[in-house]
Amino acid sequence: MRRQPPRPRNSPPQSHSSPSSSSSEFEFNISISPRKASSSLCPADELFYKGQLLPLQLSPRLSLVRTLGSSTSSSDYTSSSSSSVATSAARDSTESNSSTDSTASFPLLHPPPLDCCDSSRPSSVTDDEDFFFKPPKNKSSSGGFSLSRFSSVFKKDPKTNLHHHSSSSSTATTAAAPSSVKRMSSTAKEVIRKYMKKVKPLYEKLSPKQSSNIKTESSSSLKDSGNNIRGTTTVTTVTAAPTVVSSGGGLSISFSGNLMKYTKRGRCAASCPSSMRSSPNHSGVLTRGGFPVHQGSCSSSSSNNNSVSSSMEELQSAIQGAIAHCKNSMLQKNLVSSLEI
């Protein structure tokens, strides 16, 4: 018998050329846990609400949205939705528990805390939540801020300004709002009082000046009118006095000036002197030369005096009527000015 050569100890065993044995060498096992699969998938109701995308971070807003949607439906639907809310809450808790392992290896996937999570996308859900759950703001804060601005113009104390700004910023709460409004109203009253204290003395100084100006104007007008009336009388007395009779019994001279007026034909027209306005008896009768005739003059001038006397009387009456009219008008003006004062 032939002896077979010994086999090496480290030689691998002979493999059969079967497809099963070759495929078994490249097999590998994949284990999938159901919790991790559920964490990667979310239903569409949790991502969209009324056609708008909700914030991607998990928050209690989902339960609020579902409660709002369930309030509009019937009671049967509310019961089913409450059960779904409970299941979704349990699912959220399981997802949060399962996500702790992944966040340890990937810190960037860790969601920020709920206090600072705000989606950059505008959402109607956030507006609804603000409308339902936020207290209404007091509108008096804007008025208080304007009053603090107005008072800061007159006040220079930095402490008071800081106090007003802090009070205006703290009016978000309803309890602090009425107290701040009262403070602003009190500061506005103080500002108005200070303004009136500064303005009153100026007004009191100006008002007597105006009244004194009016009084001086009225008194000056009265004095001017009195001087006009007195001037006529004084002129007449002065002009009546210097009528002097010459030693030879000739003509008397009056200081009324040259009243001669030469016309183209060479004739002269005489007018009455100023003394005739008040005392026509002392003025005498005018001649053609403008000189009055004394009583002791010659008889040849008597015929001329008779012819001129009628015209002079008419002039005197007309002048006296004009003087009376002027006096009446001046008196009326004085009365009107006194009534206006």
UniProtKB/Swiss-Prot annotation:
Region described as Disordered: 1-29, 67-122, 158-185, 206-230, 288-310
GO molecular function: kinase inhibitor activity
Assigned keywords, A-Z: Brassinosteroid signaling pathway, Cell membrane, Lipid metabolism, Membrane
Assembly mode: A C-terminus-derived peptide binds BRI1 in vitro.
Name the UniProt record assigns to this protein: Probable membrane-associated kinase regulator 1
One GO cellular component term: plasma membrane
Predominant cellular place of this UniProt entry's protein: membrane
Low complexity bias: start-end ranges: 12-29, 67-108, 167-180, 297-310
Task performed by this protein: May negatively regulate brassinosteroid signaling.
Subcellular location: Cell membrane
UniProt feature, compositional bias: Polar residues: 208-230
One GO biological process term: lipid metabolic process
